[in-house]
Amino acid sequence: MSELNDLLTTRELQRWRLILGEAAETTLCGLDDNARQIDHALEWLYGRDPERLQRGERSGGLGGSNLTTPEWINSIHTLFPQQVIERLESDAVLRYGIEDVVTNLDVLERMQPSESLLRAVLHTKHLMNPEVLAAARRIVCQVVEEIMARLAKEVRQAFSGVRDRRRRSFIPLARNFDFKSTLRANLQHWHPQHGKLYIESPRFNSRIKRQSEQWQLVLLVDQSGSMVDSVIHSAVMAACLWQLPGIRTHLVAFDTSVVDLTADVADPVELLMKVQLGGGTNIASAVEYGRQLIEQPAKSVIILVSDFYEGGSSSLLTHQVKKCVQSGIKVLGLAALDSTATPCYDRDTAQALVNVGAQIAAMTPGELASWLAENLQS
């Protein structure tokens, strides 16, 4: 082992010691003050892992267990980069159920607003007293504003129109740049000696405005705890679509009951604070409710955001979706609507819905905006 110590720097040895744990300290090396603080912070959180306890490993090594939650929050904000902080805070709430991370006012105000923290707040807001809830609302507002700014741009771009390569535009927008026409128009500016083509007259395409008048859009959102990312993005997406002319947007949340949140769709913060995560699911009743909202089936879309694990009757769900499709309603089932579009869903139920005419996919919000722009044609 002395040969290994000769090959590795002290910092590298300390990194291996942090990875391997306290048992490796005598073999590798001790920790300096900074590394020991890192070890304390990591041990405070991950020392409570059930698998470690089953193996007989003690938790909270080297004094880490003596940290209070506020002290732990302060320490990780000093010791780690932002990406690691968000992961640690998320694991504390969602993996280990350390609820005072988001129910303690001092701790909550110290935490960095992020989507991970937003998820944690939505899972635990029912435990918060009014003062903590007010602080949580400010966090929700900040994170939602950041998501809204990003998604609103994607929605506007999707509905701005398709490029018309036959018509020239004199408005210089990068996304409308016509590469081939620009080459043809500037061939006379080719310099053989320099081996370069100088662009003096760039060309741009115009766009054909998409028509989306008099469409009705119903978003049915599963409130299962596993769907929290999709709930967040559905709320923000609905607010973005609400601002578009010619689209009437409804947002309905469901578990075993159905709650129409359309009155709050323009305010995604208020909407998210009303969502109740967890519980069972009765998807069929949500689809039936959505179908009853429709006024002109041929000008309507129902988007069902769910993992398709039906707590009620799967055959009744299939029947309700079939009735929607047969009436002329476009039905899109989304197993995930978030930034990664990584689904986990009941494939048998999803296939049954495909068999009666629904489309099933997992999409990012930008992909959903593009899908809607293509399908909402008058």
Swiss-Prot record:
Any Pfam family matching the protein: VWA_CoxE
InterPro entries found in the cross-reference section: LolB (IPR050458), Uncharacterised_CoxE (IPR008912), VWF_A (IPR002035), vWFA_dom_sf (IPR036465)
GO biological process terms, semicolon-separated: bacterial-type flagellum-dependent swarming motility
Alphabetized CDD domains for the sequence: VWA_YIEM_type
Name under which the protein is recorded: Uncharacterized protein YehP
Organism: Escherichia coli (strain K12)
Gene, per the UniProt record: yehP
